Amino acid sequence: MLDIKQIRENPELVQEKLNRRSAAKDYDLTPILQLDERQRELESSRVQLQTRGNEISKLIPQKIKGGSDPKGEEIKALKEEGNTVKNQLSSLEPQEKEIKAQIESLLLQLPNLPSDSTPLGKDETENVEIRRWGDEYLPKIKVLPHWEIGEKLGILDFERAVKVAQSRFVNLIGAGAALERALINFMLDRQIEAGYLEVMPPILINTTSLQGTGQLPKFSEESFKCSEDELWLAPTAEVPVTNLYRDNVIEGEQLPIKHCAYTPCFRREAGSYGKDTRGLIRLHQFNKVELVKLVHPETSEAEHEALVKDAEAILQALKLPYRVIELCTGDLGFGAAKCYDIEVWLPSSDTYREISSCSNFRDFQARRANIRFKEKGKKGTQYVHTLNGSGLAIGRTMSAILENYQQEDGTIKVPEVLQPYLKREVIGKS
């Protein structure tokens, strides 16, 4: 959530930064500014009334004690004025409450401001490639798409998943299930070694949690809701892990806080009709290891770069070719101030596909979820900066392995770092 004080004091600057996101989208700050002005008028009236009420409370006993009002006319008038002040204060309270709710509702609809270092651009075509890694590991043979080789080997079963659920689900069979488990454990082990504390959070979460990290109210159609219980299926572990600290004041010495978490993730993919209808790239249910950081604002940028490196380290260990892309302002996610996408090479389609999105939200989520920290020896508190990224999406990693590690005989060579987990060197037909 944006800072209303920043909007009030620098409306032109905030408007200009919002406009960097999309020339086609009009983020009108006028209603917020008008409501904010009205709220401050009401607040000023309330303070004046409270001051006068306090004066009356002191004057009445003084008049009684001093005997300066033998007929009690002044005291009577003061009491009547006091009652009027009380009534006026009572009428102000619901007005202030209503306007505050309206302001918050409008603020929740506004995206984060792009970082000044985020490249300007209208859409994904103007994202900037930062680096590539692993060209020497590009396959030398023509390969089948991961869903074809997976079905041939009997480790991916899409047909019966449709029978059990619907499209965009998969059954992992035999070595497919084992490979999924191996990837989860390998990724968690590596990130724990890198200093992340593992969390296994609930995957059913409440509305307040989704609002805190920015998925609600903007993207309600993207998530699965259990309406009878007012709970949602988590779209990413970012939500429950970040909300562990909601309404908390953290001691400054505890920062940075680094968590890794494996969870199933659930997304309706409402806006992706017709996209990636085959394979593991875009499922309603998928597994993911997420990295979440709560950091000091002064170290935010450095911690973001380190987060990207931690995600890259998994792909390097697996020897999967990838590239890092910096998203331009027009392709930036709703809550992100700055974002890098890591894209893995999928040879069957001769393209790179996103496997991790590493975002710096600055204080956007912390302000929504009220996550603050206090530095020793300093007055007051500050909002933390939150960062997160996939470390990695398991299904997409599996799809990259099934394609990049295909052999001419139709088997899959198991990446060396996964062999201790799988207890095998090759995946053949089940």
Swiss-Prot record:
Class of this enzyme: ligase
Function text: Catalyzes the attachment of serine to tRNA(Ser). Is also able to aminoacylate tRNA(Sec) with serine, to form the misacylated tRNA L-seryl-tRNA(Sec), which will be further converted into selenocysteinyl-tRNA(Sec).
EC id: 6.1.1.11
InterPro entries hit by this protein: aa-tRNA-synt_IIb (IPR002314), aa-tRNA-synth_II (IPR006195), aa-tRNA-synth_II/BPL/LPL (IPR045864), Ser-tRNA-ligase_type_1 (IPR002317), Ser-tRNA-synth_1_N (IPR015866), SerRS_1_N_sf (IPR042103), SerRS_core (IPR033729), tRNA-bd_arm (IPR010978)
Sites where the protein binds L-serine: T236, A237, E238, E290, S390
GO molecular function: ATP binding; serine-tRNA ligase activity
Entry keyword Chloroplast: no
Pathway participation: Aminoacyl-tRNA biosynthesis; selenocysteinyl-tRNA(Sec) biosynthesis; L-seryl-tRNA(Sec) from L-serine and tRNA(Sec): step 1/1
GO BP of this protein: selenocysteine biosynthetic process; seryl-tRNA aminoacylation
Gene3D superfamilies hit by this protein: Bira Bifunctional Protein, Domain 2, Serine-tRNA synthetase, tRNA binding domain
Record text about domains: Consists of two distinct domains, a catalytic core and a N-terminal extension that is involved in tRNA binding.
SUPFAM superfamilies: Class II aaRS and biotin synthetases, tRNA-binding arm
GO annotation, cellular component aspect: cytoplasm
Family recorded in the similarity comment: Belongs to the class-II aminoacyl-tRNA synthetase family. Type-1 seryl-tRNA synthetase subfamily.
Keywords recorded for this protein, A-Z: Aminoacyl-tRNA synthetase, ATP-binding, Cytoplasm, Ligase, Nucleotide-binding, Protein biosynthesis
Protein name in UniProt: Serine--tRNA ligase
Coiled coil, from the record: none
Quaternary structure, from the entry: Homodimer. The tRNA molecule binds across the dimer.
Compartments in which it is found: Cytoplasm
Residue positions binding ATP: R267, R268, E269, E354, I355, S356, S357
Catalytic reactions on record: tRNA(Ser) + L-serine + ATP = L-seryl-tRNA(Ser) + AMP + diphosphate + H(+); tRNA(Sec) + L-serine + ATP = L-seryl-tRNA(Sec) + AMP + diphosphate + H(+)
